Design a protein with these regions (language model features):
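Aromatic- and Lys/Arg-enriched surface recognition patch
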Residues: 58-117
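Mixed-charge, low-complexity intrinsically disordered regions
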Residues: 1-5, 65-66, 105, 114, ...
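Short, charged beta-turn/beta-strand-edge "cap" motif at the junction between a beta-strand
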Residues: 48-54
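Short, charged, solvent-exposed linker or helix-capping segments at domain edges/interfaces
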Residues: 13, 91-97, 128-130
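A contiguous binding-surface segment within folded domains or other stable secondary-structure elements
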Residues: 37-39, 55, 60
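Compositionally biased, charged N-terminal/linker segments
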Residues: 1-39, 123, 131-133
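A cross-family signal for N-terminal binding/gating loops and helix N-caps
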Residues: 4-11, 55-58, 116
Length: 133
């Protein structure tokens, strides 16, 4: 899962970029950066609107694996490149995720400030179904 404030970068902006994708940069937390490093080309990621909305709004696909973040002067952190895959027909709110006991283990709930986090396959299926894609 990748998190962004929608007033900074939203699923609608991601959609407009199209198939060329964008660089997902600016991650300055080591745990989040390590999660970026684990991603493989073709991996799907939920796109979460943080702070404003607090909801999963869509899905993006990794098109380029971890490389040195061009915005990091010290070259310690990495970025990836993602492209828009699909928008959820119904956004999945943090409130609804918290209500589902099968999702209580997610980093989204346990480590709410983490900007990049894994989602296991079972949880992915539950959330995907909630979004009625």
């Amino acid at each position: 899962m990748l998190k962004s404030e929608p007033n900074v970068w939203s699923i609608d902006q991601q959609k407009k970029v199209g198939s060329k994708g964008i660089t997902w940069d600016g991650v300055r937390n080591y745990q989040a950066a390590n999660n970026l490093k684990k991603m493989k080309k073709g991996d799907l990621c939920f796109f979460y609107h943080s702070n404003i909305g607090r909801e999963i709004a869509g899905i993006v696909m990794v098109v380029k694996t971890a490389f040195i973040d061009p915005t990091d002067r010290d070259q310690k952190f990495v970025a990836i490149k993602v492209k828009f895959k699909e928008q959820l027909k119904k956004v999945v709110s943090l409130e609804n995720i918290k209500k589902n006991k099968a999702l209580n283990h997610l980093s989204l709930i346990k480590q709410s400030r983490l900007s990049v986090m894994p989602v296991d396959f079972k949880s992915w299926k539950i959330i995907y179904k909630m979004g009625k894609v």
